[in-house]
């Protein structure tokens, strides 16, 4: 979704929210939470407050009028009823005959509500310097995480990684072979963004940064001499992330055409841009997801930008055997999340030994 459309959608949701949700939104902007995160949270709040009104838990006609006292006095049983509603309601925007939303969606909803309750009960200050209320019912609600062993996750993911020579092979395919699969018209469109697309994919494969971090890179953030890219991590923390040397050529090729092809000016600070009606703007995450899917499907298997991040992490661990180093590269606070990469590499090593 383009930034302009995202802002419009956020404004529509803000228009129907209670005042304290707007305060929450404004507070999180200062951290800063990304607009994408806040948009997803606002959608969850709209769903929750709509249920409060429709179920009669809140005795009001519209969600704007749901008072703080409703949230303060909400019982654990009320929240459990809401969770059951999510599990049992007909699924929307799908042809599936299944009912209810996924556990992942429910966890996301509860995470958004926990963030709001934490703000209202701990972070915000009224005129007396106290929170709006103290009772946090969200602390009584447990979430169920998706159960899957590391072996299962590794098995599911390793076929979607471009390990070893496949990393460069993927880039070479886009650079030299992909155009041969296209019609004349499609080839012309491909050439318009070829250098930019290669630079985006190379950046993620060479650094392992998140999609949201990649699209928000500015020109000043990328240093080709030190081979460092500065990004804003989750929680608003700035980080200097090294990238592998193979990406440098793709950045240089893109920079050679960026100004003329995308008609950028000094005001266009975004590194990765797109051109619409002769106006340059920052590329949006959905556009990157689509281009990664398009090229990867033609090359080997359809993947997401996050799988490119997994690719870098797995390759880096294979070279270093250091979970700490991989965690730092990915911007993780602990090494627990890197256990997956060790499992993938251990399986690869076992397969290599079996073939001796």
From Swiss-Prot:
Coiled coil: none annotated. It is found in: Cytoplasm. GO terms for cellular component: cytoplasm. Gene3D superfamilies: 1.10.150.130, Intergrase catalytic core (1.10.443.10). It comes from the Bacteria. The keyword Cell division applies. FtsK is required for recombination. Residues 16-121 form the Core-binding (CB) domain. Site-specific tyrosine recombinase, which acts by catalyzing the cutting and rejoining of the recombining DNA molecules. Essential to convert dimers of the bacterial chromosome into monomers to permit their segregation at cell division. Binds an atypical recombination dif site (difSL). Binds preferentially to the left arm and cooperatively to the right arm of difSL. In contrast to the XerC-XerD complex present in non-streptococcaceae bacteria, XerS acts as a single recombinase required to recombine difSL recombination site. HAMAP family: Recomb_XerS. Its main location: cytoplasm. Belongs to the 'phage' integrase family. XerS subfamily. The gene is xerS. Keywords: Cell cycle, Cell division, Chromosome partition, Cytoplasm, DNA integration, DNA recombination, DNA-binding. GO terms for biological process: cell division; chromosome segregation; DNA recombination. This is Tyrosine recombinase XerS. GO terms for molecular function: DNA binding; tyrosine-based site-specific recombinase activity. Residues 169-354 form the Tyr recombinase domain. InterPro entries: CB, DNA_brk_join_enz, Integrase-like_cat_sf, Integrase_catalytic, Integrase_recombinase_N, Integrase_SAM-like_N, Recomb_XerS, Tyrosine_recombinase_XerCD. The active site is at residues 210, 234, 306, 309, 332, 341. It comes from Lactococcus lactis subsp. cremoris (strain MG1363).
